[in-house]
Amino acid sequence: MIKAIIGKIIGTRNDRWIKQYKKKVLAINTLEPTYEKMSDTELQNAFEELKKRVRSVEKDLQEKTLLEVLPESFAITREASKRVLNMCHFDVQLIGGMVLNDGKIAEMKTGEGKTLVATLAVALNAMKGESVYVVTVNDYLAHRDSKEMEPLYHFLGYSVGTITASVRDDDERLEIYSKDIVYGTNNEFGFDYLRDNMKYSLEHKVQKSHAFAIVDEVDSILIDEARTPLIISGPVNRRMENYNKADEVAKSMQVEVDFTIDEKNRAILITEEGIKKAENLFGVDNLYKIENATLSHHLDQALKANYLFFIDKDYIVANNEVVIVDEFTGRLSEGRRFSEGLHQALEAKEGVSIKEESQTLADITFQNYFRMFSKLSGMTGTAQTEATEFLEIYNLEVVSIPTNLAIKRKDLNDLIYKSEKEKFDAVILKIKELHDKGQPVLVGTASIEKSETLHALLKKERIPHTVLNAKQHTKEAEIIKDAGLKGAVTIATNMAGRGVDIKLTDEIKELGGLYIIGTERHESRRIDNQLRGRSGRQGDPGVSQFYLSLEDNLLRIFGSDRIKGVMEKLGLKDGEHIESKLVTRAVENAQKKVENLHFESRKHLLEYDDVANEQRKSVYKFRDELLDVNYDISVKIAENREYALNQIFSKLKAFDNQNLSKEELLGLKNILKEDFNTNIELENLEQADSIENFVAEKLKNDYENKMKALDSEQRSRIERIVYLQILDNAWREHLYTMDNLKTGINLRGYNQKDPLVEYKKESYNLFLELIEDIKVEAIKTFSKIQFENEQDSSDAERYLDNFSEEREHESVTYRHEEALDEDLNAAIKVFSKTPKRNEPCPCGSGKKYKDCCAKSGPKKGLFAK
């Protein structure tokens, strides 16, 4: 109350920002007559002078210089836009551009021209000479926006590229990223970052810097998709029959007898009766013994798949595959899979082909990817409801930009019915009334299942209509564009079609504009506001209203008791509804509860990912050092050798150079032979003044002699590549261990321990082990590298050039996989893990290992003895 009164007196924080920006708008507008008089060449030259001014100062002063040249830059960009695009930036769009340049989120209503607004901040920040990324939610918008704005950028002397999933060639991607301005989707940018950190050459890395990014539909990308990490992964061998068996067991279990469902937290709890039944059906005496951990995990996922996830709501089945439906957009999430075996459980449930589970090779959340940028900003029509999260997680403030024209849309109170049937009957009557009148209507549903229900009812009433859900996603833009035609009836799942304007003719405006009907409140108020926002663009008339029932998930789970009590007191008959601000407020309170749950969930995910992120940054930084041709890796190898030997000597009891028994010396001799491929006579160890110094010098000399066959450049490249391979393999195993740690860490809570604190402690210890393992494994591998003296440089080059990077769509969340050349991969594995005597020899001879390289070592190649 007090806050509201103060706000009215001195204005809100948002009001004060807008007031400051309006002063700068005046400065920009005063420059307009000057630039209008210039020829195209003069205008372009003026812009080039601004670029030179920005690039001439030190990097840490460039941001300050951008603010100084902002009025001129914005004025020139606006004038260029008028000439090239025949579009003029309104004053409110200039404000939006300044908000973006300040690293904030510009909340701009639908139809206010966000695509054009972005050009102001993009053109200004590209002056620094580093690529500016414009991030969109799908390939269609990335391609459309870049092509529409490209003539303007070209006029200003900038190059433009677009990264989409269809760009498969690495050289082409490298070329696109070299452009001044790059448009693309959040997935493509994120995956390219991960792929960059699997490359074996700095020149092949596509993302050279993370200077400035503008995220369109920022709420969708940074909020809705924040819980879905990007993962590059490889297959893990699991027995496929376990999924089917777990599915059979799950389907035989009864709700409230064998398990209970917690809908609020989307969890399933197995009862004692359920555990006994499962043990009997699996044929085990204790489901939770360590050897049965896989079975219990499969059962948990099978229960979730059968009782918490529903076809045509959470996923669809198409082409013998289970395809996820994005809960926020209603779009199909092609290539994305549920993790931890849930997707396989769904495949078993639906009787389609079961694909392998996978091991994480590289991963990152959108939260940590976008927080890498020196400056980040965003645009959306709906951000204020999530302003706290944007500020806490991303340090992004939200500024609501005034509309160019006043909003004329009428947002009516919700209508609430007792049952879903009564609600849909009322919706059909309203649609029929509007259709007969000729007024277009857009109907929003919460799932494919509900859109199909409405489709059947409209078909029965013979009302022509179009359905837009995940099954028709390829026609999305065309369907949404036509939603404003006379008599059009369009059913859309959630807010599929974001980014596409629904334009109205004068005739439609006379009829009252686009009528929005929401058939269910979403868990997030923001999604509801997006649906409303499809109507009333740029001062157009329009109406929005939600039709709800007590059987809707939101009201049933979170908030219907109070509303149900009101309806019972009123004694409403079948088909009657209640409509009041009190009820609408109760619904919004229920939504706030859910929003808070989701916020805490995303925050919780980030707290865990922050732990891994610090480790990821350390590993990737070291990786870049190894890729640098100027990095002296010989120093690192010498350090590793010293460390590995210290580890060995520290384990020898009572070690003080000469107090080792003959047995201990023999043990040391065997270790040096087995781990480092170094032969030292026992008598030499016995006679050495300092065993430690003697062994260290021997290992060093042996290694130097082995590497004489190579020139310095070849040696450096091979050492770096082999070290990178060791690092990558160790990092992948570390990620696998971290995944397992995270999976079971919440159980620590039962022991009165904070799972997050425990996770931080154990992951830190695991990281220390990772560093130690890399050092020891590196020196073991390097000690076994050998070139035959007669081997020429072309042979070495052949091995070096055999590194190929292949991208494949795999079977986990947004998965792509990259593979190294099998020959070198296998060669490294030969000596990092010695084969058993009766296993096939890895050299490819076809003989058993004991009859081949176990005797004499590999006959050829990098690792020949």
Curated annotation (Swiss-Prot):
It is an enzyme of class 7 (translocase). Its cofactor is Zn(2+). ATP binds at residues 93, 111-115, 501. It holds the Pfam family SecA_PP_bind. Disulfide bonds: none annotated. May bind 1 zinc ion per subunit. Zn(2+) binds at residues 841, 843, 852-853. GO terms for cellular component: cell envelope Sec protein transport complex; cytosol; plasma membrane. InterPro entries: Helicase_ATP-bd, Helicase_C-like, P-loop_NTPase, SEC_C_motif, SecA, SecA_CS, SecA_DEAD, SecA_motor_DEAD. It is a peripheral membrane protein. Keywords: ATP-binding, Cell inner membrane, Cell membrane, Cytoplasm, Membrane, Metal-binding, Nucleotide-binding, Protein transport, Translocase, Translocation, Transport, Zinc. It catalyses: ATP + H2O + cellular proteinSide 1 = ADP + phosphate + cellular proteinSide 2. It comes from the Bacteria. It is found in: Cell inner membrane; Cytoplasm. One of its GO terms (biological process) is intracellular protein transmembrane transport. One of its GO terms (molecular function) is metal ion binding. Its EC number is 7.4.2.8. Part of the Sec protein translocase complex. Interacts with the SecYEG preprotein conducting channel. Has a central role in coupling the hydrolysis of ATP to the transfer of proteins into and across the cell membrane, serving as an ATP-driven molecular motor driving the stepwise translocation of polypeptide chains across the membrane. Monomer and homodimer. Part of the essential Sec protein translocation apparatus which comprises SecA, SecYEG and auxiliary proteins SecDF-YajC and YidC. Belongs to the SecA family. This is Protein translocase subunit SecA. It comes from Helicobacter acinonychis (strain Sheeba). The lineage of its organism: Bacteria, Pseudomonadati, Campylobacterota, Epsilonproteobacteria, Campylobacterales.
